[in-house]
Swiss-Prot record:
Domain TRAM: 8-66
Organism: Bacillus cereus (strain ATCC 10987 / NRS 248)
Active site location: 415
Highest taxon of the lineage: Bacteria
Family listed: Belongs to the class I-like SAM-binding methyltransferase superfamily. RNA M5U methyltransferase family.
Keywords: 4Fe-4S, Iron, Iron-sulfur, Metal-binding, Methyltransferase, S-adenosyl-L-methionine, Transferase
Protein name: Uncharacterized RNA methyltransferase BCE_0363
This protein's record includes keyword Disulfide bond: no
Length: 460
């Protein structure tokens, strides 16, 4: 008969612990008799007094009360609202410490999930200046004391904290959004109230082209009616000549989803333009576009290096999105085929190929695991397969398709080390060897880490 394990700690108990590790969301991990306790702001190696605030069967949560010893990597967060906002998780850790923690995270999952203990994991490629890197700001609008507030939701709530600037956001976007808030307030625009489903302005979004300097402004409203629209647009366009596009998106639904279905251009163009390396991209209000183009170039350069192209290869890019990796590869490949399930993304991909006069990139809509076997039957043989899946990783059917097609190389671009390690294990069992793993820091001060991996087919 099994005996039920009783947790070794109780709620409201004060205990001394040593933090051993960080979780994937940046909390410190301490253990009591092997039982894990997660504590926000704890860092590995630190000795601390904590208070137990929630006890579950297999783990508990604690609050950091007092540090007995401090990590040499601990620092004061530079953002005044760091502890209220959920946007960053690692500002209390030096940037060097962040990069080391991310490298360890990748190594750990390679061993624990992938069983790949001997694979070279390189040091994380970080940023020279890990601030003001985000090119897209999406802020909720609210009302307080008769005025508009714009900022972010307090962690775990829908309470908007007013914020003049964000340290990881492009300053151009911050400046624009604060001025737009003042202009809208002056012209009597009401904020959306989600409890009453009243009011006009739900969110404001700004997109900034880091290379071109062009900005797009998006008003997301509950109703198609935007009072004093003409005067608002004139004032914004006069004050901000770099704003090349002002767009309205209407979302009448009671939902947490930000965008509605209807988008209208109010001023200028439907697109702004930006470059990653030598490739030019047209970016619409709804386009997926990497939020840190500087590090995206680092990631794509490494992808291109791993693909080892000399101009004679056929490459398939699964989960190709707006064609950003496909077009990078098309600079060196004979032919690139990109596949993506979102039709609008494929329209963007075709537009971007035309924009760059690239005739050797072809795009198809559908599930990669359906479209790629169809191409295979039509005689498309990939020398190199590139995959860049969402966080859930590759569909099992796609992994089986890769194993059946036997491309010489697989380059796997990942935003989730855990699903990456799981998928590498499947490909290893199917005849591939993982040669090297290169983590890239796309989102400094957060726990996210991207990786690009080179796999080669082992001929038996």
């Amino acid at each position: 008969m099994s005996t039920k394990m009783t947790p070794p700690v109780e709620k409201n108990e004060f205990i001394d612990v040593v933090f051993e590790d960080l979780t994937h969301d940046g909390a410190g991990v301490a253990k009591v008799k092997g039982y894990p306790i997660f504590v926000k702001n704890g860092l590995p190696g630190e000795e601390a007094q904590i208070k137990i605030i929630k006890v579950k069967k297999n783990f508990a949560f604690g609050r950091l009360m007092k540090l007995h010893t401090e990590s040499p990597y601990r620092k004061d967060a530079e953002c005044p609202v760091y502890n209220q906002c959920g946007g960053c998780q690692l500002q209390h850790l030096t940037y060097e410490g962040q990069l080391q923690a991310k490298e360890k995270q990748v190594r750990d999952v390679m061993q624990r999930i992938g069983g790949l203990s001997d694979v070279p994991v390189h040091p994380v490629l970080g940023m020279k200046n890990p601030w003001v890197y985000r090119n897209k700001a999406q802020v909720p609008i609210g009302e307080r004391e008769g005025g508009l507030v714009a900022g972010f939701y307090r962690q775990g709530t829908h309470d908007i904290i007013n914020m003049e600037s964000c340290l990881i956001q492009a300053e151009e976007n911050d400046t624009l959004i604060q001025e737009v808030k003042r202009i809208c307030e002056k012209h009597g625009i009401s904020a959306y109230n989600e409890e009453r489903n009243k009011g006009t302005l739900r969110h404001v979004m700004a997109r900034y082209g880091q290379v071109t300097g062009e900005i797009m402004l998006v008003f997301i409203t509950r109703t198609a009616e935007l009072p004093n629209k003409k005067a608002i647009i004139e004032e914004i366009a006069t004050k901000f000549p770099e704003v090349k596009s002002i767009v309205q998106n209407v979302n009448p639904k009671r939902t947490n989803v930000i965008f509605g279905d209807k988008t209208t251009v109010l001023y200028g163009s439907e697109y702004i333009y930006d470059f990653i390396g030598d490739i030019k991209f047209a970016i619409s209000a709804r386009s997926f576009y990497q939020v840190n183009p500087e590090q995206t170039k680092v990631l794509y350069d490494k992808t291109l290096e791993y693909a080892k192209l000399d101009g004679n290869e056929t490459v398939i890019d699964a989960y190709c999105g707006i064609g950003s990796i496909s077009l990078f590869l098309a600079q060196k490949a004979k032919k690139v085929y990109g596949v993506e399930i979102v039709p609008e993304a494929i329209e963007d991909a075709k537009r971007n190929a035309a924009l760059n006069n690239m005739t050797n990139a072809e795009f198809g809509v559908g599930e990669a695991e359906v479209v790629i076997p169809k191409w295979y039957k039509e005689g498309v043989i990939a020398d190199t397969m590139v995959v860049d899946p969402p966080r859930k990783g590759c569909d099992e059917a796609l992994l089986n398709t890769i194993i059946d097609m036997k491309p010489k190389r697989v380059v796997y671009v990942s935003c989730n080390p855990a699903t990456l390690a799981r998928d590498l294990k499947v490909l290893e069992e199917g005849g591939y060897k993982t040669q090297e793993v290169q983590p890239v820091d796309m989102f400094p001060h957060t726990t996210h880490v991207e990786c690009v991996v080179l796999m080669s087919r082992v001929e038996k």
